[in-house]
Curated annotation (Swiss-Prot):
This is Large ribosomal subunit protein uL6B. Gene3D superfamilies: Ribosomal protein L6, alpha-beta domain (3.90.930.12). It comes from the Eukaryota. It comes from Schizosaccharomyces pombe (strain 972 / ATCC 24843) (Fission yeast). InterPro entries: Ribosomal_uL6-like (IPR000702), Ribosomal_uL6-like_a/b-dom_sf (IPR036789), Ribosomal_uL6_a/b-dom (IPR020040), Ribosomal_uL6_CS2 (IPR002359).
């Protein structure tokens, strides 16, 4: 396998968003807030030139070149997060025992009761910057919102994972909380 001498990718920064890069510590500021990400573990060169960011790899192998697109996607998701935000919608699915959900601490802690008729209360603490609300338009739906895609999606995964059915046939017992829709809070025209 050969090595590429030089490989780069360019990301354009939209209006109203400022990006600051210091020693691969990226800070993105926008109308919805501020996000920070440490990219020191990714061995690439980041340069901010005007309203663009350039990702550069010198003498990179195939895996090293793949880091360009990873860093590109991370920063692009941060830009989308501070301009539009991220929203996950999850549906409560049950056959017999209705699942009860309570939100505490301003929608940052989710309590799940009566899952498969069990007496225990399952408690999930959401990651920082993530809020959970119960949908008023659709029955048995919760909405998870935040600016960081990583935190919103990980909080949704934690809620889904705590409701795994164990020691039963999962083809028959479909009860749980599942992601039904993913998108942005503010859609751009």
């Amino acid at each position: 396998m050969g090595r590429d001498i030089y490989k780069d990718e360019t990301l354009t920064i939209p209006e109203g968003v400022s990006v600051d890069i210091k020693a691969r510590l990226v800070t993105v500021k926008g109308p919805r807030g501020v996000l920070k990400q440490n990219l020191r573990r990714v061995d690439i060169e980041l340069k901010k030139q005007g309203n663009t960011i350039k990702f550069i790899v010198w003498h990179g192998s195939r895996k090293h070149n793949a880091c360009i697109r990873t860093a590109y996607s991370i920063i692009n998701n941060m830009i989308i997060g501070v301009t539009q935000g991220f929203r996950y919608k999850m549906r409560l699915v049950y056959a017999h025992f209705p699942i009860n959900i309570n939100l505490t601490e301003n929608g940052t802690v989710v309590e799940i009761r009566n899952f498969l008729g069990e007496r225990i209360t399952r408690v999930i603490k959401c990651l920082p910057g993530v809020t959970v609300s119960i949908s008023s338009a659709v029955k048995d739906e919760i909405i998870i919102e935040g600016n960081s895609l990583e935190n919103v999606s990980q909080s949704a995964a934690n809620i889904k994972q705590i409701c795994n059915v164990r020691n039963k046939d999962i083809r028959k017992f479909l009860d749980g909380i599942y992601v039904s829709e993913r998108g942005n809070i503010e859609e751009l025209e």
